[in-house]
Regions:
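Small beta-barrel nucleic-acid-binding modules, primarily SNase/OB-fold domains
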Residues: 3-162
């Protein structure tokens, strides 16, 4: 879906989710080397530039070969850059999703702080849809509720941006 975009679009400021905190089993911190798009980031792990796909979300395409840039894709990418560029992140794996996807990207929840998860922040801003690949995942219900809230409030994809 192509769209004209909204140059004045500013997503909501990322807010911690009450009662949600980074679990003790996270890995990191890892420096972000590049934000690829709204749901993929590259981080430095043991000297290797490694691609990470955020679990449970799907953002509009901006870099897929042979596909047009989708509505709100640039905005999702910019917001992800605002959240993660120059930051150190922590990765939480989810056994239900496996370690890698079909493109050899690590599958993870990406945490910026003790109580701020990027995956959820993207949905809260209305710049990502909840996405279940095959099996249910740890934060599925929370992500689905956040998506419904974004829809109800007409944020991002569900507002005037598209």
């Amino acid at each position: 879906v192509a769209c004209s975009g909204d140059a004045d679009f500013i997503p909501i400021e990322a807010q911690p989710e009450p009662g949600l905190s980074m679990p003790p089993a996270v890995e990191g911190p890892f420096p972000v080397t590049r934000v690829v798009d709204g749901d993929t980031v590259r981080v430095l792990i043991e000297g290797q530039d490694t691609s990470v796909r955020l679990i449970g979300i799907d953002t509009p395409e901006t870099v897929a070969p042979n596909r047009p840039v989708e509505c709100a894709g640039p905005e999702a990418s910019v917001y992800a850059e605002q959240l993660m560029s120059g930051e150190d992140v922590y990765l939480e794996l989810d056994a239900s999703q496996g370690t890698y996807d079909n493109y050899n990207r690590i599958l993870a929840y990406v945490w910026l702080e003790e109580d701020l998860m990027v995956n959820l922040a993207m949905i809260d801003a209305g710049l990502a849809e909840e996405y279940t690949y095959d099996d249910p995942y740890t934060y599925q219900q929370l992500f689905q509720e956040a998506e419904q809230d974004a829809k109800d409030d007409l944020r991002g994809l569900w507002g005037q941006i598209c």
